């Protein structure tokens, strides 16, 4: 169906979001058109504000509005343990369970040769640099339990094995092929408890 240009652009914009197909994009566009103008302006300002004012922590790579992030700045956290995750949303998922008290390292992706993503395309060099600090004694690999996540975990474990740093992988209480961000706190807690040494 042919829509006026402003609606078409709005629909196209919504379709750029993950999981939003044409039908959902049309529903969202018409929902926004039915909203009060001040609510739409607040929504637009929130989007722009988030884009302009959020950055990645220079230490761990987590999304933040201050650098270093609040997790890296927290002196109560155990600096001897680093949990390696794929995305900032995985840090949020881990933090929800309130059981992990170490540091994080966000890779911003996973090794995926089919997509042309190699080890140098994600934050593995930054991880290796962080591990030169004698304080780190354990690395928990909490990449997603799918092919890319497993390949990334195996690659990192092979790199770190000679260092003598204790390596563990979160247990597969998480569904294979699933994403960490969608797991509930109990599942994440059990997966963390059941991690295994590599």
Swiss-Prot record:
SUPFAM superfamilies tied to this protein: Recombination protein RecR
Pfam families tied to this protein: RecR_C, RecR_HhH, RecR_ZnF, Toprim_4
A GO molecular-function descriptor: DNA binding
InterPro entries (alphabetical): DNA_Rcmb_RecR, Rcmb_RecR, Rcmb_RecR_Znf, TOPRIM_dom, TOPRIM_RecR
Start-end of C4-type zinc fingers: 57-72
SMART domains xref list: TOPRIM
Residues passing through the membrane, by range: none
UniProt domain Toprim: residue ranges: 80-175
CDD domains in the cross-refs: TOPRIM_recR
Gene Ontology biological process: double-strand break repair; recombinational repair
Assigned keywords, A-Z: DNA damage, DNA recombination, DNA repair, Metal-binding, Zinc, Zinc-finger
Family: Belongs to the RecR family.
Role, per record: May play a role in DNA repair. It seems to be involved in an RecBC-independent recombinational process of DNA repair. It may act with RecF and RecO.
HAMAP family noted in UniProt: RecR
NCBIfam families in UniProt: recR
Name of the featured protein: Recombination protein RecR
Naturally occurring in which organism (per UniProt): Bacillus subtilis (strain 168)
């Amino acid at each position: 169906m042919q829509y006026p240009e402003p609606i078409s652009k709005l629909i196209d914009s919504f379709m750029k979001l993950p999981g939003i197909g044409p039908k959902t994009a049309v529903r969202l566009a018409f929902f926004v058109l039915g909203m009060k103008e001040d609510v739409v302006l607040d929504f637009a300002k929130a989007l722009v504000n988030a884009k302009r004012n959020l950055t990645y922590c220079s230490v761990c790579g987590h999304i933040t509005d201050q650098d270093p992030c609040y997790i890296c700045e927290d002196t109560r956290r155990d600096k001897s343990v680093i949990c390696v995750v794929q995305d900032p949303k995985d840090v949020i998922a881990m933090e929800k369970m309130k059981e992990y008290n170490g540091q994080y390292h966000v890779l911003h992706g996973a090794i995926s040769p089919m997509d042309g993503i190699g080890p140098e395309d994600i934050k593995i060099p930054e991880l290796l640099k962080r591990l030169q600090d004698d304080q780190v004694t354990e690395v928990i690999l909490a990449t997603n339990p799918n092919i890319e996540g497993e390949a990334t975990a195996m690659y990192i474990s092979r790199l770190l094995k000679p260092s003598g740093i204790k390596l563990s992988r979160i247990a597969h209480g998480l569904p294979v092929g699933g994403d960490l961000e969608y797991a509930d706190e109990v599942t994440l807690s059990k997966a963390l408890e059941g991690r295994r040494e590599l």
